[in-house]
């Protein structure tokens, strides 16, 4: 094929001299939108209910609803259309223009794009050397008209051109196609990872059974099914568990020391028992040292935990067997302490914690039963003890399960964030490779920066153009390609082109050339881009020689007489992209035009060069006169001296041999042969052998060995490996010191604290329920062991009703469907607000605490010592336990009758008030959403109030109990018949023991609360970092995807990015009925000139960019959603419709009518541009319909193309057309005429390659009804 092709500047001979080559111009984007088209318009009606007849009234209502919905849809589409017009008008309309309204003749029908009159007048022809108003326009517009410096990869500032409108419009991004994401719920809290996982309106359980299962589900935690994942989880929390274990050992040492002190304070001393307690302290201290050594491993954690449980059991047994006044209530406090700390601070699984808690409880009950079997009140004490131990175990479970679930959930969410990040990273790398295979890195990076940058609403679009001097441009055309294509099927044609251009791409990489575009059977590339090279002319000549050699192989294999015609010229180029959609990297300049004509005026199998190129070759090649002017009018007109390469000189042969030898040595040193190049090699899997050239590295290509190894890895293993490295690398101490305050445990950064405070704990209802359960246990304990009173029953009933109401309102959040809206709203306000939930939690804990000791005020508070002293007429200091036994009142622990003549009942077991207060402290620890400082303040308040009550108004209650317990333990049978009081054990007074044990509990619970909150905050911080990294990667991925979808059709990009596709899978499809349009500005070549005043033609390209941008905005309108922009070549705009199932309307042919409407809209738009820019651009448009073949060719730089007779004829309709007219074929005429479009017959037109054809002019759309 011969004739020039327009790949160079707008207005080169391509728009006129080579229309036959436009058949292969293509890069169509298949619409993947959410607007499926139905023939005849979309109708939405009400569906008929099954089983019922449709009455006429119902039919009428349905029809009315359909009409109303259609009317609303039309209004919505009209509103979108007006908004699109307003966006377009921002640049074209001036203050003196009439407003866009119903009376404006230019506002109806097609919705024009208006530009400011002053902007066009001041630019007009000046920017192309026709006046002196350009500088005024630049000053008024606030931007420079200069092109960005060569090699610049900056953002908007680097380009200097004026930015335009929001970035979604600036970069040609179709917003209506990106609305798949759901809008966030208005009441949902934002900004915190983890978010609100609670129930929402409209979701949640549907019945009471499901609601109960949902409540039970929050306390379930299972081992991960994968052993590897479970080990990662253990590693994830190993340091925290190690810290928790050390903390537990410290508090156990404290408890053992307290037990030793209590035993040492009361004679007689038993050294064996003291030795066991001291040995336990020593063992725990040794274990604490070992657990904090660097050699302590994750596998040692379980062994240390079970060893500690064994030590606790030994201490439990020894503590209960110590000589003391026997009592079934002795040892309850440390048993409760041991049980709870095993659940909360010991990092063991639930089964081990439950077994340990049950065993400790059983040991206490068994030893108490054996030692106090003769007590007639033992049953009440044992029942109370069972209730206390049961409550402790339940609270332990309620604390252990949510904590473990939270930890496992935090681990799982962190892993999911990392998994999503790595997945996004892999996809992003694929997108980067695909993107950078189409656009050079500096252009792609600048576009992505502009997407992310906030842009001002300015007059003109940014133009991505850079100027490069001293480059060589090569054009190569396959002579005889038409006969080759005629012998191939659609698949064979795609495979042949793919194989051929894959070889050319490989040769271009080896010869340091950058392939620009493939135009049908024409291939052109540039050397000296993106990085300048001194040997750019040599590279192009060598590339041409290799291409001629490669085509000879095709000739031998196929038997078809095909050959290459190569033309080369050296000079200056402008490179970049134009328009808003379907970008393709291209070059423009008069030198590119000349190179194009050098190929057209060349000879088959020869390299045709200009004198400029010859001057760069330094005599390394033998040449002969080319006489190009004899074969090409352009060369003759411009008196271009040309030459044909004969052969390279001996010097050049030696240099080439040396380079080849070095390449072989480098290949051998790598250790394997380069892979065979074939068409089936996907473009991003092939990097031209074993190495990547410097130019390709600059364009984003990686080493194939590293990439293949990366892609072959299992994604799950990759996630686990990455997480393992991150776990090993993170430092808990460093994170705490950098981000968290030491005592308050608040984040140092206010934003972090704000995000953390917005987290919603959807287990709040379970916390309230657990605290209410503690209240019930306290009630049962008090009812069992404390004398009954009306006040007791009324107070407990009141508290029960209040707590039931609180539990009811809190649990509604997890069962939203069962209750009315106001209750749901109240529950959400409580649960979703940290302040409200904290206040409700404090209220609940207060009720539980009051229920623990308020009955104390109903007990007899008389001083038993004083009564006995008066009875025996002795001083109170001489009263002992034997006086109790000798009292005439027959006092005993089991007697609830008031003594000393008072009517108030006797509460002989006041220590159970203390144990109830301990249970209320445990209820305080259940509320995980309350901060550790808040818990500390609350627990100190509880301790202070209770200790004041014990030590001041009700101290005699505890003194009396001490005396009665001692008396009850005296064995008078061993007195040998004497009247003396036998020797008996003494005990530390309860009024001394009570503050100590409560302080120990407060300390342990505070340490646990600090550990829980510290763990939660560190998990939040780590997960936040993982989430932010994931979001950054997703944001980068979104930028790449938006750019990528603006270059390749979405289905084509998805095809190449799919991991599961085969390497030998080509992309091609046959389309049954496609409408194709070519629209060219016929006289743009007259407008384009390269002068110093217009920045060597850049300002002319800026004008073309604005025109193409207007066309791109028009094709983005919703009514043209069936259309696809294929590409722009110079000043020619190519579009098609019906390329996929979502845009092809087989019955209604609406995709054909849409393309005809679009063509008329372009004509009207061009007229208006001429009116306001004082230019006289003339547009010719050609339309045709028929079958096409769509596919992707090019291994290194994929290019979506459409081929077929339909495309060829559409191109001929443009090239043979008349300025300012739309020419259509007979097939197109039949479809449009059947839809009442206004057409007129032009007559018979001679078309190259087709002979004579009857054609028609499209004058207008259907008449308005």
Curated annotation (Swiss-Prot):
The biased composition feature labelled Basic and acidic residues covers 18-32, 68-79, 164-184
Query: In which compartments does the protein localize?
Result: Cell membrane; Cell projection, Cilium
The entry annotates sugar attachment on: 873, 890, 976
- Recite the UniProt cofactor note for this protein: Binds 2 magnesium ions per subunit. Is also active with manganese (in vitro).
Q: What is the effect of changing residue 492 to A?
A: Decreased inhibition by G(i) G alpha protein GNAI1
Amino acid composition bias (Gly residues), ranges on this chain = 139-158
Membrane association type: Multi-pass membrane protein
According to the UniProt record, list the residues that bear Phosphoserine: 113, 168, 669, 757
Region Disordered: what ranges?
A: 1-205
Where along the chain is composition biased (Low complexity)? 57-67
Q: Which Pfam families match?
A: AC_N (PF16214), Adcy_cons_dom (PF06327), Guanylate_cyc (PF00211)
* Residues noted as binding Mg(2+) 1 in the record, renumbered to the chain: 477, 521
- Residue ranges of the Guanylate cyclase domain? 472-599, 1075-1214
**Keywords annotated in UniProt:** ATP-binding, cAMP biosynthesis, Cell membrane, Cell projection, Cilium, Glycoprotein, Lyase, Magnesium, Membrane, Metal-binding, Methylation, Nucleotide-binding, Phosphoprotein, Repeat, Transmembrane, Transmembrane helix
Binding residues annotated for ATP, in chain numbering:
477-482, 519-521, 565, 1127, 1201-1203, 1208-1212, 1248
Q: Which GO molecular function entries does the Swiss-Prot or TrEMBL record give?
A: adenylate cyclase activity; ATP binding; metal ion binding
Binding of Mg(2+) 2, residues: 477-478, 521
Report which reactions are catalysed by this protein.
ATP = 3',5'-cyclic AMP + diphosphate
Question: Which top-level group of life is the source organism from?
Answer: Eukaryota
Biological process according to GO: adenylate cyclase-activating G protein-coupled receptor signaling pathway; cAMP biosynthetic process; cellular response to forskolin; intracellular signal transduction; positive regulation of cytosolic calcium ion concentration; regulation of insulin secretion involved in cellular response to glucose stimulus
Family indicated by similarity: Belongs to the adenylyl cyclase class-4/guanylyl cyclase family.
Q: What is known of its domains?
A: The protein contains two modules with six transmembrane helices each; both are required for catalytic activity. Isolated N-terminal or C-terminal guanylate cyclase domains have no catalytic activity, but when they are brought together, enzyme activity is restored. The active site is at the interface of the two domains. Both contribute substrate-binding residues, but the catalytic metal ions are bound exclusively via the N-terminal guanylate cyclase domain.
Report the protein name in the record: Adenylate cyclase type 5
Provide the species name.
Canis lupus familiaris (Dog)
């Amino acid at each position: 094929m011969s004739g020039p092709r327009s790949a160079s500047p707008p207005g080169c001979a391509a728009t006129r001299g080579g229309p036959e080559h436009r058949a292969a111009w293509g890069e169509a984007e298949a619409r993947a939108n959410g607007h499926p088209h139905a023939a005849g318009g979309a109708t939405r009606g009400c569906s008929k209910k099954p089983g019922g007849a449709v009455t006429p009234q119902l039919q009428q209502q349905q029809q009315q609803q359909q009409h109303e919905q259609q009317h609303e849809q039309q209004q919505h589409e009209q509103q979108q259309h007006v908004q699109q017009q307003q966006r377009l008008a921002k640049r074209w309309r001036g203050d003196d223009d009439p407003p866009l309204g119903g009376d404006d003749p230019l506002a109806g029908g097609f919705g024009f794009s208006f530009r400011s009159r002053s902007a066009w007048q001041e630019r007009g022809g000046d920017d192309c050397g026709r006046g002196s108003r350009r500088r005024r326009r630049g000053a008024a517009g606030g931007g420079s008209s200069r092109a960005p410096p060569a090699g610049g990869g900056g953002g908007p500032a680097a380009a200097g051109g004026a930015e335009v409108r929001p970035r979604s419009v600036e970069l040609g991004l179709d917003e209506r196609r990106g609305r798949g994401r759901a809008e966030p719920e208005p009441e949902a809290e934002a900004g915190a990872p983890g978010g609100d996982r609670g129930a929402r309106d409209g979701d949640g359980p549907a019945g009471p059974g499901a609601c109960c299962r949902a409540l039970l589900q929050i306390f379930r935690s299972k081992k991960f099914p994968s052993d590897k994942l479970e080990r990662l989880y253990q590693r994830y929390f190993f340091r925290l568990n190690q810290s928790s274990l050390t903390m537990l050992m410290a508090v156990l040492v404290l408890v053992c020391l307290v037990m030793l002190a209590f035993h040492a304070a009361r004679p007689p001393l038993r050294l064996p028992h003291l030795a066991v307690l001291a040995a336990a302290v020593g063992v725990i201290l040794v274990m604490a040292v070992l657990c904090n050594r660097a050699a302590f491993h994750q596998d040692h954690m379980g062994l240390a935990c079970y060893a500690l449980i064994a030590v606790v059991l030994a201490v439990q047994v020894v503590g209960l067997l110590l000589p003391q006044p026997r009592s079934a209530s002795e040892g309850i406090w440390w048993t409760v302490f041991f049980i709870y700390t095993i659940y909360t601070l010991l990092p063991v699984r639930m089964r081990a914690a439950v077994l340990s808690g049950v065993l400790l409880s059983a040991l206490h009950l068994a030893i108490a039963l054996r030692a106090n079997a003769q007590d007639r009140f033992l049953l009440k004490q044992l029942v109370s003890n069972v209730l206390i131990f049961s409550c402790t175990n339940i609270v332990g479970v309620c604390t252990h399960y949510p904590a473990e679930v939270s930890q496992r959930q935090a681990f799982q969410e962190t892993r999911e964030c990392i998994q999503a990040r790595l997945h996004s990273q892999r996809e992003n790398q694929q997108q980067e490779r695909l993107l950078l295979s189409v656009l050079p890195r500096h252009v792609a990076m600048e576009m992505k920066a502009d997407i992310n940058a906030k842009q001002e609403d300015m007059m003109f679009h940014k133009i991505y153009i850079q100027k490069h001097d001293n480059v060589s441009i090569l054009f190569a055309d396959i002579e005889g390609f038409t006969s080759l294509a005629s012998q191939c099927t659609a698949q064979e044609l795609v495979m042949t082109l793919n194989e051929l251009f894959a070889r050319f791409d490989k040769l271009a990489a080896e010869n340091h050339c950058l392939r620009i575009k493939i135009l049908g059977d024409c291939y052109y590339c540039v050397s000296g881009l993106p990085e300048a090279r001194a040997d750019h002319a040599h590279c192009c000549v060598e590339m041409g020689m290799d291409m001629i050699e490669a085509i000879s192989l095709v000739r031998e294999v196929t038997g078809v007489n095909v050959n290459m015609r190569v033309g080369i010229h050296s000079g200056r180029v402008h490179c970049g992209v134009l328009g808003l959609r379907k970008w393709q990297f291209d070059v423009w300049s008069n030198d590119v035009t000349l190179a194009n004509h050098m190929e057209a005026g060349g000879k088959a199998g020869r390299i045709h060069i200009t004198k400029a190129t010859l001057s760069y070759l330094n005599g390394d090649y033998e040449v002969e006169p080319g006489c190009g002017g004899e074969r090409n009018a352009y060369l003759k007109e411009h008196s271009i001296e040309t030459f044909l390469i004969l052969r390279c000189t001996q010097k050049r042969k030696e240099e080439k041999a040396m380079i080849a030898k070095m390449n072989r040595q480098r290949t051998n040193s790598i250790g394997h042969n380069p892979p065979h190049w074939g068409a089936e090699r996907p473009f991003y899997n092939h990097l031209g052998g074993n190495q990547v050239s410097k130019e390709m590295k600059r364009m984003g290509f990686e080493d194939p060995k590293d990439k293949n190894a990366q892609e072959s890895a299992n994604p799950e293993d990759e996630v686990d490996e990455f997480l393992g490295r991150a776990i090993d690398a993170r430092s808990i101490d460093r994170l705490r010191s950098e981000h968290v305050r030491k005592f308050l445990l608040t984040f140092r950064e206010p934003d972090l604290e704000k995000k953390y405070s917005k987290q919603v704990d959807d287990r709040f209802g379970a916390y309230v329920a657990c605290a209410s359960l503690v209240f019930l246990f306290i009630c049962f304990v008090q009812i069992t062991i404390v004398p009954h009173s009306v006040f007791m029953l009324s107070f407990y009933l009141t508290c029960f009703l209040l707590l039931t109401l609180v539990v009811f309102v809190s649990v509604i959040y997890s069962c939203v469907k069962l209750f009315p809206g106001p209750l749901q709203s109240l529950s959400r306000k409580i649960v979703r607000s940290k302040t409200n939930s904290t206040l409700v939690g404090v209220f609940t804990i207060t009720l539980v605490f009051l229920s623990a000791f308020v009955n104390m005020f109903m007990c007899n508070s008389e001083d038993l010592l004083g009564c006995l002293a008066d009875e025996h007429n002795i001083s109170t200091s001489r009263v002992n336990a034997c006086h109790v036994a000798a009292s005439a009142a027959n006092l005993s622990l089991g007697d609830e009758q008031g003594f000393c003549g008072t009517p108030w009942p006797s509460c002989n077991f006041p220590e159970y008030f203390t144990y109830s207060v301990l249970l209320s402290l445990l209820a305080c620890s259940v509320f995980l959403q309350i901060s550790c400082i808040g818990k500390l303040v609350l627990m100190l308040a509880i301790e202070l109030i209770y200790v004041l009550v014990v030590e001041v108004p009700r101290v005699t209650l505890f003194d009396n109990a001490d005396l009665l317990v001692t008396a009850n333990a005296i064995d008078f049978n061993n007195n040998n018949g004497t009247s003396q009081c036998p020797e008996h054990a003494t005990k530390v007074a309860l009024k001394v023991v009570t503050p100590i044990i409560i302080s120990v509990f407060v300390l342990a619970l505070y340490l646990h609360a600090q550990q829980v909150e510290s763990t939660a905050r560190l998990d939040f911080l780590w997960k936040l970092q993982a989430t932010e990294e994931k979001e950054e990667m997703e944001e980068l991925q979104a930028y790449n995807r938006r750019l990528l979808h603006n270059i390749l059709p979405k289905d084509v990009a998805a095809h190449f990015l799919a991991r599961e596709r085969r390497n030998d899978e080509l992309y091609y499809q046959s389309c049954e009925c496609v409408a194709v349009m070519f629209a060219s500005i016929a006289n743009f070549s007259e407008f384009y000139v390269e002068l110093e005043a217009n920045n060597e033609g850049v300002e002319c390209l800026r004008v073309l960019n604005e025109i193409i941008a207007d066309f791109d905005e028009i094709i983005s309108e919703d009514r043209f959603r069936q259309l696809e922009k294929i590409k722009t070549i110079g000043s020619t705009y190519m579009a098609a419709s019906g390329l996929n199932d979502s845009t092809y309307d087989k019955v209604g042919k609406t995709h054909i009518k849409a393309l005809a409407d679009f063509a008329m809209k372009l004509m009207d738009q061009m007229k208006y541009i001429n009116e306001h820019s004082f230019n006289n651009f003339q547009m010719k448009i050609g339309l045709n319909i028929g079958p096409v073949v769509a596919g992707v060719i090019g291994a290194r730089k994929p290019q979506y193309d459409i081929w077929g007779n339909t495309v060829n004829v559409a191109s001929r309709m443009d090239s043979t057309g008349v300025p300012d007219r739309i020419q259509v074929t007979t097939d197109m005429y039949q479809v449009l005429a059947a839809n009442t479009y206004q057409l007129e017959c032009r007559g018979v037109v001679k078309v190259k390659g087709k002979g004579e054809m009857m054609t028609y002019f499209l004058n207008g759309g259907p008449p308005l009804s």
